[in-house]
UniProtKB/Swiss-Prot annotation:
This is Large ribosomal subunit protein uL15. It comes from Staphylococcus aureus (strain NCTC 8325 / PS 47). Residues 1-54 are annotated as: Disordered. The keyword Transmembrane helix does not apply. GO terms for cellular component: cytosolic large ribosomal subunit. The lineage of its organism: Bacteria, Bacillati, Bacillota, Bacilli, Bacillales.
Amino acid sequence: MKLHELKPAEGSRKERNRVGRGVATGNGKTSGRGHKGQKARSGGGVRPGFEGGQLPLFRRLPKRGFTNINRKEYAIVNLDQLNKFEDGTEVTPALLVESGVVKNEKSGIKILGNGSLDKKLTVKAHKFSASAAEAIDAKGGAHEVI
């Protein structure tokens, strides 16, 4: 096979369907929009959530709760994720982001006690669960709230 003999796989290249170009194409005249009506008009159509005049679902259901503008969301790191670091490492939020353990810091890092810790580490984070702090100290490491 030579370069000039290359062809795309069968069925992989499909020409787009041009509507309104004659009755013989199968998509002429009304261009697949049916006859008259709101959806046949240019720019026509109903807004999202519109149910034809029936009271829409979002208005039938009661309002509930509120959004706390002061809410802080912490990036969560479990103990077993800290095992990837060498013994004696100082684990900081910057190191966690750099090594890909967390994608971004959000409002801070919280260390939780899921899994087991096998290394002696100095961990600096914004929050610790009681079990996580206990496990870090039990291995001879240290935890520091920043």
